[in-house]
Amino acid sequence: MFKCPERVSVKKKEDILDLPNLIEIQIKSYKQFLQIGKLAEERDNIGLEEVFREIFPIKSYNEATILEYLSYNLGVPKYSPDECIRRGITYSVTLKVRFRLTDETGIKEEEVYMGTIPIMTDKGTFIINGAERVVVSQVHRSPGINFEQEKHSKGNILFSFRIIPYRGSWLEAIFDINDLIYIHIDRKKRRRKILAITFIRALGYSSDADIIEEFFQIEEHSLKSEKDFSFLVGKILADNVLDEASSLVYGKAGEKLSTAMLKRMLDANISTLKIAVEADENHPIIKMLAKDPTDSYEAALKDFYRRLRPGEPATLANARSTIMRLFFDPKRYNLGRVGRYKLNRKLGFPMDEESLAQVTLRKEDVIGALKYLIRLKMGDEKASIDDIDHLANRRVRSVGELIQNQCRSGLARMEKIIRERMNLFDFSSDTLIPGKIISAKGLASVLKDFFGRSQLSQFMDQTNPVAELTHKRRLSALGPGGLNRERAGFEVRDVHASHYGRICPIETPEGPNIGLITSLSSFAKINEFGFIETPYRIVRDGVVTDEIEYMTADVEEECVIAQASANLDEYNMFVDPVCWARYRGEAFEADTSTVTHMDVSPKQLVSIVTGLIPFLEHDDANRALMGSNMQRQAVPLLKTEAPIVGTGLEARAAKDSGAIVVAEEDGVVEYVDGYKVVIAAKHHPTLKRTYDLKKFLRSNSGTCINQRPLCSVGDVVVKGDVIADGPATDKGELALGKNILVAFMPWYGYNFEDAIIISEKLIKQDAYTSIYIEEFELTARDTKLGKEEITRDIPNVSEEVLANLGEDGIIRIGAEVKPGDILVGKITPKSETELAPEERLLRAIFGEKAADVKDASLTVPPGTEGVVMDVKVFSRKDRLSKSDDELVEEAVHLKDLQKGYKNQISVLKIEYREKLGALLLNEKAPASIIHRRTADILVQEGTVFDQETIELLEQESLVDLLMPPCDMYDVLKSLLSDYETSLQRLEVNYKTEVEHIREGDADLDHGVIRQVKVYVASKRKLQVGDKMAGRHGNKGVVSKIVPEADMPYLANGETVQMILNPLGVPSRMNLGQVLETHLGYAAKTAGIHVKTPVFEGFPESRIWDMMIEQGLPADGKSYLYDGKTGERFDNTVVIGYIYMLKLSHLIADKIHARSIGPYSLVTQQPLGGKAQMGGQRFGEMEVWALEAYGVAHMLQEILTVKSDDVTGRTRIYESIVKGENLLKSGTPESFNVLIKEMQGLGLDVRPMVVDA
């Protein structure tokens, strides 16, 4: 069996940890959302289950009718993902939900169809209307609590906090200039401020004494004589002091004690006083108590309501319900587990499961937050403000969560409709069942809208496997609930210390989205709360262990972390007494005894694409960014070639992108051809697994997807082996470009300004040839005027134009086509208005005429040439119009299908019985198995399984069996689950086939009779104007293709394949390309492939040694000879092998010319752009250029007849046809537009005719 070639490396030891599955972020999130494969009663309260439990039960307004949710059930997809792409439909499953309705007539249960829900393919994508889409994860501000500070205009620092819920009103508190704290509810209504103490009272702390007790430590002090005065004067009372007999108040809680007050108290025989420790009259709480206009719970509630809703009558009931609704009703206010976790962590509350389940606000939270705010104000060192750009305060919303939020809004909309229907239902005439009051539209339309229109549901970038992989790992700060591109400042976009190992500092787009769209680092994972974690090795007593700990950004703050490249001895202890480490985002030289953790790998810093750049550490960050982005634009080539100089990530990137086919279990290859590979399982040779290969499919970006087998019959394969290559892969490794022999030198000025000179040899060898596939579609509909028809019989078209069309009017496969050729012939009925008056008259006299159709054929658009590689026809079948022969043929077909279906089911049953036997036969039952509905014991604990018991189990379904968890029963459950899913899938496939035989393609759009898709493949060779690039951001445009004989050559006669400009290196500071050139030359000569991972690559000295070992000049420079003259160039030139990519910006897609075409309606000037068949704008500066040359006639022609002189251009067209050559220009339409504009301003402008 063929294996991936080993790459030579200078790395001392391999990484301790393997990369996680690179698309886990997508798959894991959606799996948790749907919980496919779990029984209804085993489902956790997350995802879709959580939404249903949140919204239901729904009660009618009089509470007589209750609708409860019981469980949901997902069907099986009707078509495979590939078939959905082919048919242009959505890859989805049906969602059926079981409800229980209780009303005055009794209890009724029913399963209600709730529409379809798109499901994820195993590659982490969705197929929506036949196009693969990706839902990008969103980074947003985490719910929870944030403490901030801002500077007042007077120079004071004002502290504030903000409690941000997952859903509901924001609560903000801010100090003002007088050290009073004001509460704001909802940012939008910032002007409505409430004193913090009033708000606390409204929460239920009614008396001043209660409030003081919450904020201060209380001590009792005795008051016996005037000696105690010295201690007590100036202290703050914690409770009211009053004479119980006469109810006379001597001091109020919060008051400052004075000598006079104390004397009065002493005279009244008051012996003890409650004092607030550490309180003084300048303390914010004491100040606010003095300022507070309210003194009781009721007064505070009313004051709160008045400020929140000025103008409305402030009744106690209204006020209480408002505050309850705002913060204490789980349907309106939800912190979410995340918000509660962040809040409890910051304020030091317990972190147990019970505490985290509390999703609404508590009184203690507000008190705790105010205490923390006051600590900040008082300068407590342990209290700190939060950095909103720190990854501890930003979290990721993945696919599952985004769709869960959509489902929530859909069901909330549905809730209102259900309540209305419950109220309007007439019980006297009909019985109420769930199906009558539930409308499935709400949920289905919300999901359709999200997948089709949301900013985060994107058409997948499928240029090559890396583009696909990166798109799934992308993080966006844009989208609903996120940032706005225009308003996002510099700080949000910037690289932050907490990004280390979590978000790649390099890979982000150039332009307006810079820093807002980022990529997940290679080892990063997302935890249950949505925070990004990165792995570290734990260091214990100076020994670096192999234990791995995944840490979020806030936990990492407290750790001292050494670099992965720190020197260790054979006992994994630090060699040096000091090493470079990080603490709280700062790098410093740390004593190794203080180190607590160590990086897992140097590449944990960067994303996968950036990790594919060799010698990244020698490139400037700006160029590395371009290198990362341009690798995603590389076109898969016809002949792939893995890079000589790689980084070791190539194989993993190819595998996780899903481009290659990987063996899922050990076995032996039994059969191979271009379309499939069959492997017999090692442990069970009768079980065969077929791997279907993708052949010449069109990707989203029009490139070609084709898989080629790499194994032969008889090969032994191990799980994880590569058995077939895909697009842009070579023997299981990523192969985006070609290894090219380059010289860095100027050559006759042709490589000025980053231009690239290439040898004609590359064109002859098809080195950079790629295949593009275009899809053209035509539909025949049933129109008001009659049916459209796909036919070869097209009016006014010569026979030679129809030469390649078949009898049915569809082009034959293999035909070469060019612009204007007919692909599918179609005729459409003409409407009466399209006929000339005389024709209408003749038809009125002589009746109908046959030629009342017009040509509406599908033709090849300009700029497309190629070969027709595939044609797909979809059509509906009409039961009534079938002939007897067709009906007989259909019956035979259906009989064969049924026979095949029964066979498949019997094979499946035999396989299942064998598997059950292998697992259970002659084994002892570890526990009893009970029938869920009848409560019968099917298998007693300790029973030895015999054939009879196994057959008994075989007839039961998984839902009905109650099995305690243990190893044997866990395997049994998964076997049962797989078997039931396979049975379901067979049944769905059988029904789909039957439907197809009877009705044709029933899922065509309404009104469509027939649909034809034609695929045209074109071979694109490299040509002048194509964009090329290396992996270091060194991009350029092909400026000249030089005959091989004219290219510079080495002393041994070998010609250089490409010439690059040496001036492109120094100012760009991407020296990685030079090092790659040298190492590539040495490795090519030695016949090896090398890997130079990020920060652990080949040192310069090792490259020199390799060059000398291979007999090459140590400095990598050689003398070259001019191919044109044969003379030697004066100086030596750097030559070597560099990996160059061809990018998807091909000149063939951009070049465009117009002779005639459409004009704009208002200005009558030609439209712009290739898509509109537009013209080239001749603007103000171009006019100046022609004026400078004094070419008046040419100018007049350009500005009038070639542009917007309507009558003039008609005349010139006629004169050209007649062969005359005269220019009579009239008034340009833009002049008329100008006059109309001026008249619109109320100026009476009219052209005057002046006699000559």
Swiss-Prot record:
Any single GO molecular-function term of the entry would be: ribonucleoside binding
Q: Which SUPFAM superfamilies match?
A: beta and beta-prime subunits of DNA dependent RNA-polymerase
What does the record give as the reaction this protein catalyses? RNA(n) + a ribonucleoside 5'-triphosphate = RNA(n+1) + diphosphate
- Gene3D superfamilies associated with the record: 2.40.50.100, 2.40.50.150, 3.90.1100.10, DNA-directed RNA polymerase, subunit 2, domain 6, RNA polymerase alpha subunit dimerisation domain, RNA polymerase Rpb2, domain 2
Q: According to the lineage, what is the superkingdom? A: Bacteria
The SS bond pairs are none
Instruction: Give the Pfam families listed for this entry.
Output: RNA_pol_Rpb2_1, RNA_pol_Rpb2_2, RNA_pol_Rpb2_3, RNA_pol_Rpb2_45, RNA_pol_Rpb2_6, RNA_pol_Rpb2_7
**Keyword Transferase (UniProt):** yes
Family matches, as InterPro entries:
DNA-dir_RNA_pol_bsu_external_1, DNA-dir_RNA_pol_su2, DNA-dir_RNAP_su2_dom, DNA-dir_RNAP_su2_hyb_sf, RNA_pol_bsu_bac, RNA_pol_bsu_CS, RNA_pol_bsu_protrusion, RNA_pol_Rpb2_2
Look up the EC number in the record and give it: 2.7.7.6
Q: What does the sequence similarity comment in the record state about its family?
A: Belongs to the RNA polymerase beta chain family.
* The protein's assembly and partners: The RNAP catalytic core consists of 2 alpha, 1 beta, 1 beta' and 1 omega subunit. When a sigma factor is associated with the core the holoenzyme is formed, which can initiate transcription.
Protein name as annotated:
DNA-directed RNA polymerase subunit beta
Tell me the organism: Chlamydia abortus (strain DSM 27085 / S26/3) (Chlamydophila abortus)
